[in-house]
């Protein structure tokens, strides 16, 4: 047996990037490019023995990682080794020969290795994307059910196997004593039965939290590993050994082990029962939720201290909602209420559905307040009585101005999308509301949890943390971990077809002729695609045909409906087929859309062929129905505006980015980072693919794309109020106003001092040149239309916004509240 030092030395060397002639990179390219196990003729040379090399490398890493984990426990090195082993086995099964007899065995190994590397969502997706017929052993089937978190299926399968007469101990003993049985077959039956019995114990442990059942399961699997070793049954040695490590890892990270047992102060009576119900309700879901991800564990450990204000910076899809739910559980167990502030109406509706699903089984009511800023009697009643309230800043601000006591018994405020602080009207409103909440005289009695996917690092994050924590010492919760990986590529039109590159390397993996030219139909003479938006739509249809949900990101809201018009037109002309097989799931959304928008509106007409058109200007009732369809996965193609970059959960397997500019200005890396985070759905996709669509100007577009990907980063965070004041002072200085001797008296008494003659002239020129809106030009290839940035706004407009804000700020800072 190797020592810990020997195993560590081996794994350190074996996990070096680029080892064995970049074997894992070549393996990924090999698996991505082939179809049913066969590479295209124009594929680059990837190695004649690549399949054997991948298998040998994968098994070596897996053996070493399990041995080191058994001796020294899980570590960063074992996690890296499991991940690299999983990469190798994934390459062996992805797009492989469907007739290969060992494809099921290798897929089980890939999924288990990903799980042990900390990527349970990728492990789930490895199994979730394939058909049932995998030529697998009963033990592998049981492991598959566990990884898919289908514990009902696991219980049913294990029960049937264990209750089958031929699998009983007496029958097996009789078969061995009779002398006629195939000993290897009998030993396989014993091993598979032991695995099933162990998983029955483990399922009970996950349901009840009883450590004795877990220990029994682990003991059975240790016996199975020894028996398989003695019998030289190599496949079942791997499976039973992996299963032993798998249940050990899952138990270690389970809610039973990670959700604190120590109640918050004052919650000694209610917390134990609520904790049990919380874990049980998550366990009982169709897809059981039984563990915490690496990104969630620190926040969970800090959750019991209800005076510990948290700033949580996790990537998109990394589990921020579960962090908020755990914090809410602690507060509710203390008999205090929870308030969740979401800056977008659509996000409020989405959050309401999520929290109702989690907390309704625990007996707590959930309501959301959004829409117009007024407050109805029903709104006020909900805000005063519901245990969990979700509200937009506008609604909450109006309510608190009417009655400050409405949230006196609220013990937790969750600030969703906490990065939305900046110079826009919505961002300033959010910032001012947060300041108002922090300045309440009872603020110390109320916990604040601030969530975001794109918070900055360094001093800016420290400043935000100090602000939220009112300068109390404490660190933010920060993690770069994502549940799925991502790949950046490009779709390039070549005159007759399009090449899809699956990374940014010119020598990397590609799919040839991913989109082919469509000949002209009827009386038309020109083939399709004819422009960038056509190419994006044809690519979306191709991805959808592969079962990959596709999101087209439009950098401008006014382009979104143009896509809807093109979808309808191309379907009508016969260049695209409907993506819907049955209109029943969308019937209600269609009716609501017809009522509010009319049957011919692009958002309604495109819905009829299975495409969602989403932007913030659509009527709220229709958006609610549309978002419900999206949450159910009923639509394969979505076209969305920048709203999604502000937190709306519209995740997809593929993100198509046809344009990189807005109003002649390139989108910023921080916005792109958040948008790109939408690619790759946990528990659905193994990886997310972000693709720039390039119909023309290929060389320039490719350069711009690489620069944008390289610039993708967290958001720069700075007070919107400070930004506006700084911009006004800069403008006044530029105009020479601040050079006047009595500048401040002049500014206080002369309205014209706050206006720039040059800017006023530009605005007048724009108004004079304004033309009536033309629906035929609302396409990304032809026009720009977007909100002005702070440095583009007229000085007078900035001053008006600051003027309105200052009154609210003074009130927030100085008013006496209860």
Task: State where each predicted segment sits.
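Conserved interdomain linker/interface between the two RecA-like ATPase lobes of SF2 helicase motors
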Residues: 449-564
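Conserved segment of the helicase C-terminal RecA-like domain
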Residues: 661-662, 668-706
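A short beta-strand element within the Helicase C-terminal
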Residues: 411, 637, 641-661, 688-693
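Long, largely alpha-helical accessory region at the distal end of helicase-like NTP-driven motors
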Residues: 705-818
């Amino acid at each position: 047996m190797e020592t810990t030092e020997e195993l560590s030395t081996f794994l350190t060397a074996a996990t070096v990037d680029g080892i064995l002639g970049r074997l894992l990179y070549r393996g990924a390219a090999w698996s991505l490019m082939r179809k049913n196990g066969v590479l295209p003729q124009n594929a680059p040379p990837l190695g004649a023995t690549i399949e054997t090399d991948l298998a040998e490398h994968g098994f070596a890493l897996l053996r070493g990682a399990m041995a080191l984990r058994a001796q020294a426990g899980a570590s960063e090195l074992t996690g890296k080794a499991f991940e690299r082993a999983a990469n190798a086995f994934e390459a062996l099964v992805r797009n492989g020969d469907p007739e290969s007899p060992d494809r099921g065995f290798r897929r089980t190994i890939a999924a288990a290795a990903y799980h042990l590397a900390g990527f349970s969502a990728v492990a789930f997706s490895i199994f979730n994307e394939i058909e049932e017929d995998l030529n697998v052993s009963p033990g592998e089937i049981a492991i598959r059910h566990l990884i898919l978190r289908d514990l009902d299926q696991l219980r049913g399968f294990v029960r049937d196997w264990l209750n089958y007469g031929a699998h009983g101990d007496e029958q097996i003993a009789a078969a061995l004593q009779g002398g006629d049985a195939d000993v290897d077959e009998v030993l396989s039956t014993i091993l598979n039965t032991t695995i099933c019995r162990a998983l029955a114990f483990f399922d009970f442990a996950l349901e009840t939290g009883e450590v004795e059942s877990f220990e029994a399961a682990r003991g059975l699997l240790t016996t199975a590993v020894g028996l398989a070793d003695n019998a030289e049954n190599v496949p079942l040695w791997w499976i039973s050994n992996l299963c032993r490590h798998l249940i050990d890892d899952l138990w270690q990270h389970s809610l039973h082990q990670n959700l604190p047992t120590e109640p918050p102060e004052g919650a000694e009576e209610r917390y134990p029962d609520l904790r049990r119900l919380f874990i049980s309700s998550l366990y009982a879901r169709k897809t059981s939720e039984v563990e915490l991800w690496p990104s969630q564990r620190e926040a969970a450990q800090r959750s019991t201290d209800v005076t510990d204000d948290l700033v949580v910076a996790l990537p998109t899809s990394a589990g921020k909602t579960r962090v908020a739910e755990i914090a809410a559980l602690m507060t509710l167990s203390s008999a205090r209420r929870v308030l969740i502030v979401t800056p977008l109406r659509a996000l409020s509706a989405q959050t309401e559905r999520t929290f109702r699903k989690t907390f309704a089984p625990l007996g707590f009511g959930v309501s959301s307040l959004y829409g117009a800023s007024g407050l109805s009697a029903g709104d006020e009643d909900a805000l005063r009585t519901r245990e969990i309230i979700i509200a937009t800043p506008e609604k909450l601000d109006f309510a608190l101005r009417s009655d400050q006591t409405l949230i006196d018994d609220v013990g937790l405020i969750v600030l969703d999308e906490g990065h939305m602080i900046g110079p826009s009207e919505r961002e300033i409103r959010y910032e001012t509301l947060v300041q108002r909440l922090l300045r309440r005289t009872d603020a110390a009695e109320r916990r604040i949890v601030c969530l975001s996917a794109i918070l900055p690092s360094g001093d800016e994050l420290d400043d935000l943390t100090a602000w939220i924590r009112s300068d109390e010492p404490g660190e933010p919760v920060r993690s770069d971990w994502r549940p799925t990986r991502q790949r950046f590529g490009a779709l390039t039109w070549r005159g007759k077809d399009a090449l899809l590159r699956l990374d940014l390397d010119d020598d990397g993996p590609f799919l040839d002729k991913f989109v082919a030219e469509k000949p002209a139909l009827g009386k038309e003479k020109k083939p399709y695609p004819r422009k960038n938006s056509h190419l994006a739509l044809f690519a979306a249809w191709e991805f959808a045909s592969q079962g990959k949900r596709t999101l087209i990101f439009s950098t401008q809201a006014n382009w979104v409906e143009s896509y809807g018009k093109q979808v309808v037109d191309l379907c009508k002309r016969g260049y695209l087929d409907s993506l819907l097989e049955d209109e029943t799931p969308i019937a209600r959304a269609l009716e609501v859309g017809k009522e509010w928008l009319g049957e011919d509106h692009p958002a309604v007409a495109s819905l009829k062929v299975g495409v969602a058109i989403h932007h913030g200007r659509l009527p709220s009732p229709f958006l609610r129905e549309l978002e419900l369809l999206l949450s159910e996965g009923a639509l394969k193609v979505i076209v969305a505006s920048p709203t999604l970059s502000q937190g709306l959960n519209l995740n997809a397997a593929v993100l198509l980015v046809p344009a990189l500019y807005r109003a002649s200005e390139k989108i910023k890396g921080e916005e792109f980072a958040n948008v790109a985070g939408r690619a790759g759905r946990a528990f659905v996709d193994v990886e997310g693919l972000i693709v720039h669509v390039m119909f023309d100007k290929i060389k320039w577009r490719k350069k711009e794309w690489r620069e944008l990907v390289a610039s993708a980063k967290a958001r720069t965070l700075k007070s919107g109020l400070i930004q506006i004041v700084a911009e006004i002072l800069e403008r006044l200085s530029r105009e020479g106003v601040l050079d006047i001797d009595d500048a401040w008296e002049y500014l206080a008494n002369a309205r014209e001092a706050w206006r720039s003659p040059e800017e006023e002239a530009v605005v007048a020129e724009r108004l004079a040149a304004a033309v009536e809106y033309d629906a035929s030009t609302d396409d990304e290839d032809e026009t720009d239309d977007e909100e002005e940035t702070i440095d583009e706004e007229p000085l007078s407009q900035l001053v008006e916004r600051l003027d309105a804000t200052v009154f609210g700020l003074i009130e927030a800072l100085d008013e006496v509240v209860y």
